[in-house]
Amino acid sequence: LDCTGRSCDNGRCKIYNLDFPNVITVRNELLPAGDWEQNIPCDLNDTAWFSEVDTSGGAVFFASGVFYYFLTEQVKALVQGMADAFPGGVLVFDAANRTAVRMIAKTWLKSAKIKDVGAYFAVSDAPKEIGAWDSRLRVTSRGYMLGYNDLKDPSVSGLFRFLARVGDGVMKMQIVRIKFVGR
C-alpha cells in the first residue's frame, strides 16, 4: 500500500488513494484515511473517479508500479482522459522498456495465461513515445536510479552503480512526468 501522498503532505494537500474495492477495504483497515485523505474504490480505467477529485488547488497524480499491469492502449486512454479532466495537472509514474516489462511480468503473465507481453505498457523514450499521443502532454523523464543519485559520490556502492547502469541503461527504467496543458 503506497503512502507517497502522506510523505509529501504539507498539511494543505488533498490526497486521494485510488485502487480496486478489495484493496481499499484492506487500506481502510490498515491505513485509515487521514484528515486530508480520501480512499476511492475504483477501476482506474473507469473514469467515473475523475469527478471525485477536487482540483481547485491543482492536482499531482502518482502511479507507482501501476502501469506495468495495463495495456498500452489503456494507459493512453487514461492519460488522454486525464488531460481532458485535469488541465494544468501532473501525472508522475515509473516505466521501463519491453525487456524489463517482460521480466517484471514473467510470473503473473503465466498464471493469467497471457501470451502477448508486447501489448503491455512499456516505453524506452517516454518524451518521444508518450508525447506523440497528444499535443497537450509535456513529457519528461529521468533515470529511475541514475536520475536522482550521483554515482560519483564515494558512498555509492559498486553493486548499486552496476544495478543503476543495468536498470536505467539496458532496461530504460525511468520516472516519467507528464504535465497536462490546454490545447
Question: Which residues does each predicted region cover?
Answer:
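Alpha-helical subdomain
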Residues: 1-183
